[in-house]
Every structure is written in structure tokens, then in C-alpha cells.
């Protein structure tokens, strides 16, 4: 395990990113080559986007490597470490999918169940004709990116919103990325298991995955590790409460813990069988939009893929605009030479996670500023492709 901690060298030229795709310097130690590769990918992006602090964690053939840059808080001067807690925004959806995968493999629900089967309050609404799979994969018919401002974190208001909602498209026909969609999926998964979502995550999911630095509500004892997020105007920001926030974007975690989650996804067989099956259930693709195959929480691409196409799959239009889907004839295993990824943001934080099962390779990038997805993907792509060019990631046999 390697933990490299140092300040952001903000004077470094953006052109040094090219180092990430050049051969290693002869005689340089492997750890130094990896550090140089990550430095060259990260530092220009930090400078260009005025990112106070950033953490990278890489799983390379089962070995974790950590790289920490800058400040967790500009106010008190705390530096980023692998244990610093970041808000991960929509990367939380992959944890929600894991809980749902557990409910599926325990036969508490099926993806073709109607949503109203698991919440009687929705009976008689449009959710009589919307499946759990539609909710999980953003194809319910046009649920929006966010709840309206008028809907607060109140079950009655949330229920009333869903009861009156009317679809714009036929369920199962168009993808429109949506917190209310996958949020309801997570809520219904918890209902099928007979416990509140938050309790299931904190008491079952996180412990089963070996995560001790992952929280929905950061406990007082861990507050000193919680990074301060920063908005576009450099104002300190942290995520506030919202409807189905835990299900959609509520997880706070460290680079070290999130890498453990990535490792669990790379090697589900190392977990207890119910949780191995739960993770496997999230690694199934149901339809394509362009190059992207939609799984449960995860979005997948054939690997290798060009940087431009990977950025397009994680672009603003993919998040904000509807896209007609191409349904797969049967669920497709997202394994082998595929890159599974997820972006996540809150107003003050930006996250990106990616892994390639067939290369036994994964990485985590966490920052305390919400900066463009294209920049996060650029960092990851430089590291992943650089490692391949250095011959670090042969095919997993």
C-alpha cells in the first residue's frame, strides 16, 4: 500500500498531462512512475479548476495506492488524506443499487414488479404501470432530475408528488437521468426489506462491505475528517437535507473506503455470498444509449474507448436531456473488458469512480469542489491509459 501526500504544485504547466501517456523514464522505480503519472494527470486540472483538495485512490492488481493533494479545508488548513471524508453525490446511487441487489437476491422484490406493489399509497397512480427496473434505470417516463423545490424531506409530500405525477413518455422508452426515479427505487427496496433505508445502509450494507469511513450522517467523532466543500463563488458548502437524499446522493466517504467498495465490485466472490450476489446484480446491463450500457447504478462502456466518447457519455446532455434507449434482448453481464463508472456531485464536491473488471483495475477521484465531469474523466483516462501503456494492467486470466 502506498500513501503519497503532498501539496498541489499549482505552477506546473498543463502540458505535463502528456506525461501520463508517455513511456516511463528508464530506471525510475515503479512507485515513482505511478506517482509521476498521477501527478501529471491531477495537477493541471486542479489548477485550471481552482480545486482546493483532491484525493486519488487506485486499485492496481489488488494493491491499493493513495495520492492526496491540497486542502480539506481552507479555513483551518487541514490537508487531504486517504481518510478525508468527501460528499460523493450520485456515486451514492451505486450503494443504493447494492441494497436493491440484496433485496432482489433475497427474493423480496423483482425488477418487473410494479412500483405500487411495494408502496400501497401509490396504487391508483401512474406507478401501477411503472416497473422497478424503469425506476432503477431512469426510464419511468420523464421523472425530472430533481424534486420540485416545493417538495421537502417529508413522506407525505413525497407521496403526494408521486401520486400526482404524469409521465411525458411511455415507461421503458426514454432515459432521463433522475434523482426521484432511482430515489424511489431505493426507498421501495428498503420497504421490501421491512426497514428504513438509512438503517439498512448504516447497519447492513456498509458493514457487509467492510466500510468503516462511510456514512449517510457523519457522526460527531468523524467530523474532523469531513472536508469542507466549496461553491463556484468559493463559498463554503455542504449538502443539506432533501427528499430521498440518502437514496440519491447522500453518502459521505473517504478515498480509502470508496476504493474498498471498488475492490468489492472487482472481486464480489470475496464477500459473503448474499452480498456477492447483490453486487453481481448491479453488474447487469439493460439497454444502451450511444456507447453507454445502463446497469443498476453503474454505467458501462466497452474498454478501451476514446476519451472523447467517454466524456460524451458523462456529459451534461446525458444528465439533462431525454434519450431514446435501445433495449438489450436480455440482461447483459457487465464484466471483462468493460469500464464501469459513475460520476457524482453536490454543490461543493465532485466525485468519479471507474473500474475495469478484466484488468483488475479501479480508481476513485474525490474533490471538494464541483468541477466539470469532463475534467474528472480526463484525469481518470490519463491514469488508466497511462497504466496500460506502462504494462501495469495485463488481461486478468
Curated annotation (Swiss-Prot):
Keyword terms: Antibiotic resistance, Hydrolase, Periplasm, Signal
Enzyme Commission no: 3.5.2.6
Pfam families: Beta-lactamase
Catalytic residues (positions): 90, 177
GO molecular function: beta-lactamase activity
Keyword Zinc tagged: no
Family matches, as InterPro entries: Bact_CellWall_Synth/Modif (IPR050491), Beta-lactam-related (IPR001466), Beta-lactam/transpept-like (IPR012338), Beta-lactam_class-C_AS (IPR001586)
Keyword ATP-binding in record: no
Induction: Up-regulated by beta-lactam antibiotics, such as ampicillin or benzylpenicillin. Expression is negatively regulated by sigma factor RpoN, possibly through promoter blocking.
Record Gene3D superfamilies: DD-peptidase/beta-lactamase superfamily (3.40.710.10)
One term under GO cellular component: outer membrane-bounded periplasmic space
NCBIfam families, sorted: bla_class_C, blaPDC
Recorded family membership: Belongs to the class-C beta-lactamase family.
Note: The class C beta-lactamase family has a specific amino-acid numbering system known as SANC, for structural alignment-based numbering of class C beta-lactamases, or else the simpler name structural position. A multiple sequence alignment was used to derive a consensus sequence and then the consensus was numbered taking into account insertions and deletions. This allows use of identical numbers, e.g. for active site residues, despite differences in protein length.
Record note on quaternary structure: Monomer.
Name the record gives this protein: Beta-lactamase
Gene field: ampC
Amino acid at each position: 500500500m502506498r500513501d503519497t501526500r503532498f501539496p498541489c504544485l499549482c505552477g506546473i504547466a498543463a502540458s505535463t498531462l502528456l506525461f501520463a501517456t508517455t513511456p516511463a523514464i528508464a530506471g525510475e522505480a515503479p512507485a515513482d512512475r505511478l506517482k509521476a503519472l498521477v501527478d501529471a494527470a491531477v495537477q493541471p486540472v486542479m489548477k485550471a479548476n481552482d480545486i482546493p483538495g483532491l484525493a486519488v485512490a487506485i486499485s492496481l492488481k489488488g494493491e491499493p495506492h493513495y495520492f492526496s493533494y491540497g486542502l480539506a479545508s481552507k479555513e483551518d488548513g487541514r490537508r487531504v488524506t486517504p481518510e478525508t471524508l468527501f460528499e460523493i453525490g450520485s456515486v451514492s446511487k451505486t450503494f443504493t443499487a447494492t441494497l436493491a441487489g440484496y433485496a432482489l437476491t433475497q427474493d423480496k422484490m423483482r425488477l418487473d414488479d410494479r412500483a405500487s406493489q411495494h408502496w400501497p399509497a401509490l396504487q391508483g397512480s401512474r406507478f401501477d404501470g411503472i416497473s422497478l427496473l424503469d425506476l432503477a434505470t431512469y426510464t419511468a417516463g420523464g421523472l425530472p432530475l430533481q424534486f420540485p423545490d416545493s417538495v421537502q424531506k417529508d413522506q407525505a409530500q413525497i407521496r403526494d408528488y408521486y401520486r400526482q405525477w404524469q409521465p411525458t413518455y411511455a415507461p421503458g422508452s426514454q432515459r432521463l437521468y433522475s434523482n426521484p426515479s432511482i430515489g424511489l427505487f431505493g426507498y421501495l427496496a428498503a420497504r421490501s426489506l421491512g426497514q428504513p433505508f438509512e438503517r439498512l445502509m448504516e447497519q447492513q450494507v456498509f458493514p457487509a462491505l467492510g466500510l468503516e469511513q462511510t456514512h449517510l450522517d457523519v457522526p460527531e467523532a468523524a467530523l474532523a475528517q469531513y472536508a469542507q466543500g466549496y461553491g463556484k463563488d468559493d463559498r463554503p458548502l455542504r449538502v443539506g437535507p432533501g427528499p430521498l437524499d440518502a437514496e440519491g446522493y447522500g453518502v459521505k466517504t473517504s478515498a480509502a473506503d470508496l476504493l474498498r467498495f471498488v475492490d468489492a465490485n472487482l472481486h464480489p466472490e470475496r464477500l459473503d455470498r448474499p452480498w456477492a450476489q447483490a453486487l453481481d446484480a448491479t453488474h447487469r446491463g439493460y439497454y444502451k444509449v450511444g456507447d453507454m450500457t445502463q446497469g443498476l447504478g453503474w454505467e458501462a462502456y466497452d474498454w478501451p474507448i476514446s476519451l472523447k466518447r467517454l466524456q460524451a457519455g458523462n456529459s451534461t446532455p446525458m444528465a439533462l436531456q431525454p434519450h431514446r434507449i435501445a433495449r438489450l434482448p436480455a440482461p447483459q453481464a457487465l464484466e471483462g473488458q468493460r469500464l464501469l463508472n459513475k460520476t457524482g456531485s453536490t454543490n461543493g464536491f465532485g466525485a468519479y469512480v471507474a473500474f475495469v473488471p478484466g484488468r483488475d483495475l479501479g480508481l476513485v477521484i474525490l474533490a471538494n469542489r464541483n468541477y466539470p465531469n469532463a475534467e474528472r474523466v480526463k484525469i481518470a483516462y490519463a491514469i488508466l491509459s497511462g497504466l496500460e501503456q506502462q504494462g501495469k494492467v495485463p488481461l486478468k486470466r
